[in-house]
C-alpha cells in the first residue's frame, strides 16, 4: 500500500498543483528539513521568495529524526517535511501523520577533514580506519538516534568491518571520541573548522558545500550505489522510535532523500507549489551544484 501511495499520490497531487500554481495566494510556508539540506534549501527559498512577493518560507533544520518527532511528539505543524532518508518518513510519519513521500536526491558517505587534520597527507580510502583509531586523532559523527547520517556512519563502519576483514572495527570506532557526537551532521563542520576534531563521517555534499577535503570510500561501504542494495542491507542497527522506550531497526540502503506534506500542513496549496519548484529542472540543478545528484520523479 505504501508503494502505491508513493507513486500515485505525489504524481497526481503534485502534477495537478504544478499546473495550477498561478492561482496560489501569498502565505507562510514552514519547512522542517534535514541539516544537510540547509545550503540548497536556502538557495531555493531565496529564489522562490523573490518570484513570489509576500511569501515567507521558514526553514527549520534539524536531524531528520528530530524533524519527524516535532510532528509526532511535539505536535508542531509544518507544510513540508524533507528528510535525508525516506525511511524516516515511511516509518515515523506513515500512516498517522502523512500518507506519501517522494524521493528527490541522493548522496554518499565520505570521511571529511580540515587543513590541519593530523595525518592528512597519509589518509586514503584504504587506511582511513587505522588513521581514525590512532590515539591522538579525534573524529566526530552525528547521533544515530537523531540523524540519518549518524546511523549511516555506523552502517558504514559495519560494512567496512566486513569489506576490509577487520574484526570488531565497529565496536572500536563507536567507543572512541563519544564526546564529539552531535545532533546533526552539519554541527560537525564547526568542529572541523575550529580544529576541535580532525575528521568526521559526513555527506559528500556537505563537504563540497563547505570546501572541505574528503576521502571517498569504496562503493561497497559508502551507501551510494543502488545496485549494491543486497550488500548494504547486511548491516543493521536499532535506533530510537517514536517514543523513548521504542526502537526501530534500520538496515543499510543506498542514500536517498524524500519529502512529504504532512496531514497537519496549514498551507497545503502553497506547499505543493514550493515542492514543485524543488522538483523542477531548476531546483534539481541547485542540488547538482551543491554536490547532490537529483532524482527526477517526473
Name these PLM-found stretches:
Residues 1-4:
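Positively charged n-region of N-terminal signal peptides that target proteins for export
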Residues 11, 106-107, 254:
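Short, solvent-exposed loop/turn segments at the edges of secondary structure
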Residues 62-68, 86-89, 109:
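Short active-site-proximal "capping" loops at secondary-structure junctions
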Residues 74, 78-85, 89-103:
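Short beta-strand-centered segments that line the small-molecule binding cleft or hinge
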Amino acid at each position: 500500500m505504501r508503494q502505491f501511495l508513493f507513486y500515485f499520490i505525489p504524481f497526481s497531487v503534485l502534477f495537478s498543483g504544478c499546473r495550477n500554481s498561478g492561482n496560489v495566494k501569498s502565505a507562510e510556508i514552514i519547512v522542517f528539513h534535514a541539516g544537510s539540506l540547509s545550503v540548497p534549501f536556502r538557495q531555493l527559498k531565496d529564489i522562490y521568495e523573490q518570484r513570489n512577493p509576500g511569501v515567507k518560507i521558514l526553514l527549520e533544520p534539524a536531524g531528520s529524526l528530530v524533524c519527524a518527532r516535532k510532528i509526532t511528539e511535539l505536535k508542531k505543524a509544518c507544510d513540508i517535511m524533507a528528510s535525508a532518508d525516506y525511511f524516516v518518513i515511511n516509518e515515523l510519519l506513515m500512516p498517522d501523520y502523512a500518507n506519501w513521500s517522494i524521493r528527490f536526491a541522493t548522496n554518499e558517505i565520505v570521511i571529511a577533514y580540515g587543513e590541519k587534520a593530523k595525518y592528512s597527507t597519509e589518509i586514503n580510502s584504504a587506511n582511513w580506519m587505522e588513521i581514525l583509531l590512532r590515539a591522538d586523532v579525534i573524529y566526530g559523527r552525528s547521533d544515530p538516534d537523531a540523524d540519518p547520517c549518524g546511523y549511516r556512519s555506523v552502517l558504514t563502519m559495519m560494512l567496512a568491518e566486513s569489506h576490509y576483514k577487520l574484526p570488531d572495527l565497529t565496536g572500536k570506532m563507536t567507543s572512541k571520541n563519544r564526546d564529539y557526537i552531535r545532533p546533526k551532521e552539519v554541527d560537525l563542520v564547526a568542529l572541523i573548522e575550529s580544529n576541535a576534531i580532525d575528521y568526521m563521517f559526513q555527506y559528500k555534499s556537505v563537504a563540497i558545500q563547505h570546501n572541505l577535503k574528503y576521502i571517498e570510500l569504496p562503493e561497497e561501504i559508502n551507501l551510494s550505489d543502488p545496485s549494491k542494495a543486497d550488500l548494504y542491507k547486511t548491516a543493521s542497527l536499532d535506533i530510537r522510535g517514536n517514543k523513548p522506550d521504542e526502537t526501530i531497526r534500520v538496515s543499510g540502503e543506498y542514500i536517498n532523500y524524500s519529502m512529504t506534506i504532512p496531514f497537519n500542513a496549514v498551507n497545503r496549496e502553497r506547499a505543493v507549489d514550493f515542492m514543485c519548484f524543488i522538483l523542477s529542472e531548476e531546483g534539481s540543478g541547485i542540488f547538482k551544484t551543491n554536490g547532490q545528484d537529483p532524482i527526477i520523479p517526473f
